[in-house]
């Protein structure tokens, strides 16, 4: 179809497709990031995490295929914790400041969903924020009755008793969020590719006419 539209310039088909596909890939990344931010109530760390979506393969004349992906070793490939989303309060209460913590932390994932109190279950404690050695702030729960692996903090202080194992409160990973949004925007991207291809065809024909080739 592209070759037919180009007519005597049909030899430009691979180059036309390459430009159209790479343009669409760049536009798609921007679209995906915007839609993820519109759908999910991410905090600053969460917004950085979803930026792992990048163009991993550029289209060429020989292979007119571009790939957008979060790679398996990127932070965004792993199941995220609730600490990447909106929480109330937004800061951890650790050490002596624990006495100032609210009775229950609240959080949600989707912007159009209500904040939910993280009151815990029979096997797990209430959810609360902690800052890890890596400086990441995550939402965790204590696994009641299961002893922690370490009895001392990184600074060498003995942990309070009972010292129970911490587990992360999970939420969608960057990959999962982009996958959900892709299913919602696939038709839009197909139209973008068609528009970019037609635009590139018009440009090539106009350039050829200006040079007197056709």
Residue positions per predicted region:
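Short, Lys/Arg-rich flexible segments
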Residues: 1-214
């Amino acid at each position: 179809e592209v070759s037919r539209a180009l007519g005597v310039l049909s030899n430009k088909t691979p180059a036309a497709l390459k430009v159209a596909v790479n343009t669409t890939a760049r536009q798609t990344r921007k679209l995906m990031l915007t839609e993820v931010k519109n759908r999910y109530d991410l905090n600053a760390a969460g917004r950085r995490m979803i930026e792992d979506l990048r163009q991993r393969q550029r289209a060429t004349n020989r292979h007119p295929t571009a790939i957008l992906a979060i790679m398996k070793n990127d932070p965004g490939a792993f199941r995220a914790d609730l600490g990447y989303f909106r929480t109330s309060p937004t800061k951890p209460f650790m050490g002596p400041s624990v006495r100032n913590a609210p009775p229950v932390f609240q959080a949600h994932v989707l912007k159009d969903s209500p904040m939910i109190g993280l009151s815990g279950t029979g096997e797990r404690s209430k959810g609360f924020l902690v800052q890890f050695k890596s400086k990441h702030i995550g939402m965790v729960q204590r696994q009641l009755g299961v002893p922690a692996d370490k009895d001392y903090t990184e600074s060498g202080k003995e942990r309070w008793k009972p010292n129970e194992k911490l587990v992360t409160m999970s939420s969608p990973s960057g990959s999962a969020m982009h996958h959900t949004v892709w299913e919602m925007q696939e038709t839009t991207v197909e139209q973008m590719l068609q528009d970019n291809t037609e635009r590139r065809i018009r440009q090539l024909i106009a350039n050829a006419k200006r040079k007197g080739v056709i």
